[in-house]
Amino acid sequence: MAAELEYESVLCVKPDVSVYRIPPRASNRGYRASDWKLDQPDWTGRLRITSKGKIAYIKLEDKVSGELFAQAPVEQYPGIAVETVTDSSRYFVIRIQDGTGRSAFIGIGFTDRGDAFDFNVSLQDHFKWVKQETEISKESQEMDNRPKLDLGFKEGQTIKLSIGNITAKKGGASKPRASGTGGLSLLPPPPGGKVTIPPPSSSVAISNHVTPPPIPKSNHGGNDSDILLDLDSPAPVSTSAPAPVSTSNDLWGDFSTASSSVPNQAPQPSNWVQF
């Protein structure tokens, strides 16, 4: 199922590549491009590197039609599928395979040195990615095979939590909360503070109010002759000065001041003889 989901991606395309038949290697010293007929390539065309899954494919195709000439599957790089020559950086030896499993070694070369560099780097990057994917898959398998930690609470297991400065003590009784009327608690005054009660505002109004003196009543009788004599007699003149009003804040001083402010009228003799 995983192989069906894999898609083919293109890693590198070079429009000009030459193919050479190479002689068998006589020793393990490596291949040399100088042993090839570099001026007479056996085939020229286009090179394309693709990848499907972890395998890279070097495909030699026709420049015009795109027909496949040869294909070299690469499972590891550097490896036996792709080798560099010992005397040049522009030539390589690849192992091509057909559908029946037969294989052969041929030489390829690039005219431009930059094309050879891109060919080499494309293969290196692909297999570097393959190595990283392999390590990640191994780590995930190791994590799955490890015994899982049981972080749940066992039956009857408890823990103790400390929140800020509040710590729970074993066997300690909680302090009762004082509740006011209606379930509302009053906050205590701040430490070191003094509560000052302002004087009532009504005291200023009472101290500034002056009670008027009462009107004195007449000492004469109610007969007609007395009324006539009172009309003829001159009005009495008071010589006493009223007492000063106290502006003290004492509430009872206003009442004593009002009583003392009443003038004392002395009876004066009348010039008419009363009958």
Curated annotation (Swiss-Prot):
A motif (WXXF motif 1) lies at residues 252-255. CDD domains: PHear_NECAP. Residues 168-275 are annotated as: Disordered. Changing residue 273 to L/N/P/S: Loss of binding to AP-2. GO terms for biological process: endocytosis; presynaptic endocytosis; protein transport. It is found in: Cytoplasmic vesicle, Clathrin-coated vesicle membrane; Cell membrane. The keyword Phosphoprotein applies. InterPro entries: NECAP_PHear, PH-like_dom_sf. Its main location: membrane. Residues 233-248 have a biased composition (Low complexity). Changing residue 274 to A/M/N/S/T: No effect on binding to AP-2. One of its GO terms (cellular component) is plasma membrane. Residues 256-275 have a biased composition (Polar residues). Expressed primarily in brain (at protein level). Keywords: Cell membrane, Cytoplasmic vesicle, Endocytosis, Membrane, Phosphoprotein, Protein transport, Repeat, Transport. The keyword Ribosomal protein does not apply. It holds the Pfam family DUF1681. The modification Phosphothreonine is found at residue 211. A motif (WXXF motif 2) lies at residues 272-275. Gene3D superfamilies: Pleckstrin-homology domain (PH domain)/Phosphotyrosine-binding domain (PTB). Residues 187-201 have a biased composition (Pro residues). The WXXF motifs mediate binding of accessory proteins to the ear-domain of AP-1, GGAs and AP-2 through hydrophobic interactions. Selective binding to the GAE domains of AP-1 or to the alpha-ear domain of AP-2 is tuned by the acidic context surrounding the motif and the properties of the second residue of the motif itself. The WXXF motif 1, which is preceded by an acidic residue and has a glycine in second position mediates specific interaction with AP-1. The WXXF motif 2, which is followed by the C-terminal carboxyl group negative charge, allows specific interaction with AP-2. Interacts with AP1G1 and AP2A1 components of the adapter protein complexes AP-1 and AP-2. Interacts with the GAE domain proteins GGA1, GGA2 and GGA3. Belongs to the NECAP family. This is Adaptin ear-binding coat-associated protein 1. The lineage of its organism: Eukaryota, Metazoa, Chordata, Craniata, Vertebrata.
